[in-house]
């Protein structure tokens, strides 16, 4: 009550007294804490103005609460809240001071780090290596042209590229296979075998003489076109002449692509007409432009056949001077020539069937008939040329029988027909089914050749009169 009554006389003095008492009594440890916080704030080099204002506000706070009386704890709570945040923010401010120093040092740290990285970037040599703008073909060409002998091995080419370009020196094992592939797949590079007296490993590689203008104006940066090697004409002619000198059984014919180890043109020309062989050779030359020329045919050309009229005239002229067996053979060959002309015109190519009933069966009638027909058989040699009489018919039948047999048994059939003549009825019945069989030209050509040879021998021995 005394405090409220004396408040009007001396407000300022009462306020100061109340403030001191309140601070000394009610807030015992907070004043000291505030001072300590002030000292700590001053130690952090913070401005002293805001803490002084806070203390003044704390000093001015209690008179307002004193007039209300019971609201002193609430009035005292305001400075405590004001000082409370001060207490709470004191440590962060101190920490902030330290954090500021750390921020300064930390800021200097990244700056120094960036400066260090900026200083190390131009010192790295690997980033400055750039791949040369040359292709592998250009690099190989450079290596070969700079060598004294104008040829290098694969290892020599790789060594030149590594010494000349640092980029390839750093990546040496990766591009060696690329060099090897370009050497083997491009026609502008030619492989040269190593000499026997030159020790070492690997073949030499050189440039094709025709690939000198492969690059534009001598610059290795640009290539005109892909080089393709063309085989020279004179080399092919020399190879053809050399292989043709081996004959029909040459190595080329044995290693050809024909069905039986022959070249297609040789296989076609060996067993066909000359025109067909020429056509086949032309087709093979078009299909295989680098193939060897066809070799000579394996079989010799056939002997030309004599006309049947001329052969019959010569046989009639020499018939009187020859023996019976030779006359029978000449007559048989004349009939063969005539039959050959007929068969060639008709174009029959069927084979001769076997004749099991060609030979007569052994019986008494055949023996009796042979004894009675012996004179007719002897006259059959001349009768076959004249073409009349029973004996002549029998002789003609024997000749036909001997002709229908293979050419190897012509002489044996002729002798059998001479020593064992047949009767007219028996011969006709036996030969009738044989004559109905169409003739084949399989054995006509050898028979004609034998006829021509026999005629030449007879003419040389007995000249025509």
Curated annotation (Swiss-Prot):
Pfam family, one: Forkhead
UniProt cross-references to SUPFAM superfamilies, sorted A to Z: Winged helix' DNA-binding domain
Phosphoprotein is among the record's keywords: no
Location relative to the cell: Nucleus
This protein's UniProt keywords: Activator, Developmental protein, DNA-binding, Nucleus, Repressor, Transcription, Transcription regulation
Amino acid composition bias (Polar residues), ranges on this chain: 1-18
Subunit structure: Interacts with POU5F1.
Name this polypeptide is given: Forkhead box protein D3
Organism name: Mus musculus
